[in-house]
């Protein structure tokens, strides 16, 4: 269910702010979004997997916190990230 190393490296390269960046809010949010999307596909086939649903809720909350942090720190980066990821806000 987790992302493979190649999927992670592609996402990191796409969203990194500078070379070697793996911890910026943009990268973290992009990785969480990919994991969330993968889990949503899992729940289409496994509706009663409540243990994984708890992990999904934790990921969504963590993404929300990171987005709130980014919005307070740099609004333009926040808006660009939301548009690039296709999130609703």
Swiss-Prot record:
InterPro entries in UniProt: Ribosomal_uS15 (IPR000589), Ribosomal_uS15_bac-type (IPR005290), uS15_NS1_RNA-bd_sf (IPR009068)
GO annotation, biological process: translation
One Pfam family from the record: Ribosomal_S15
Record Gene3D superfamilies: 6.10.250.3130, S15/NS1, RNA-binding
Gene Ontology molecular function, alphabetical: rRNA binding; structural constituent of ribosome
One of the record's GO cellular component terms: cytosolic small ribosomal subunit
UniProt key word Transport: no
UniProt keyword annotations, A-Z: Ribonucleoprotein, Ribosomal protein, RNA-binding, rRNA-binding
Keyword match Transmembrane helix: no
Role: One of the primary rRNA binding proteins, it binds directly to 16S rRNA where it helps nucleate assembly of the platform of the 30S subunit by binding and bridging several RNA helices of the 16S rRNA. Forms an intersubunit bridge (bridge B4) with the 23S rRNA of the 50S subunit in the ribosome.
HAMAP family: Ribosomal_uS15_B
UniProt family annotation: Belongs to the universal ribosomal protein uS15 family.
Protein name, per record: Small ribosomal subunit protein uS15
């Amino acid at each position: 269910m987790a992302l493979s190393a190649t999927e992670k490296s592609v996402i990191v390269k796409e969203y990194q702010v500078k070379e070697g960046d793996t911890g910026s809010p943009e990268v973290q949010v992009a990785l969480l979004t990919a994991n969330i999307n993968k889990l949503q596909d899992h729940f289409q086939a496994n509706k009663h997997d409540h243990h994984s649903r708890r992990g999904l809720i934790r990921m969504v909350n963590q993404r929300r916190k990171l987005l709130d942090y980014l919005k307070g720190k740099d609004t333009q980066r926040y808006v660009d990230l939301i548009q690039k990821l296709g999130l609703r806000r």
